[in-house]
Amino acid sequence: MTEAKKLVRTLTGKVVSDKMEKSIVVLIERRVKHPVYGKYVSKSTKMKAHDEANDCKIGDTVTIAESRPLSKTKSWTLVKIEERATQI
């Protein structure tokens, strides 16, 4: 018997908080077409993700993947840092 490989959901967003230990808050923005008016509207969602090495800083663009629940609100893990935030 061969088992089908399960696809893992991944999302890309911007880190808006890194104040927690080994956790980050990622803002995911998407554009959705309004069902009645047809206008494209920006919607956003904040997801908490696990950052094992505490590498992320505010402003970084990251990719996160869905995982098992790690806490009450955290069920995503950091896959990679796409782009570092510029230091001013």
From Swiss-Prot:
Q: What is this protein called?
A: Small ribosomal subunit protein uS17
* The entry's keywords: Ribonucleoprotein, Ribosomal protein, RNA-binding, rRNA-binding
GO cellular-component terms in the record? Answer: cytosolic small ribosomal subunit
Q: How does it assemble?
A: Part of the 30S ribosomal subunit.
A GO MF label: rRNA binding
Which Gene3D superfamilies does the annotation name? Nucleic acid-binding proteins
Give the HAMAP family listed for this entry.
Answer: Ribosomal_uS17_B
Task of the protein: One of the primary rRNA binding proteins, it binds specifically to the 5'-end of 16S ribosomal RNA.
Protein family:
Belongs to the universal ribosomal protein uS17 family.
> Where does the source fall among the domains of life?
Bacteria
Whose protein is this, by species?
Saccharophagus degradans (strain 2-40 / ATCC 43961 / DSM 17024)
Q: A Gene Ontology biological process annotation?
A: translation
What the entry lists under InterPro entries is as follows:
NA-bd_OB-fold, Ribosomal_uS17, Ribosomal_uS17_bact/chlr, Ribosomal_uS17_CS
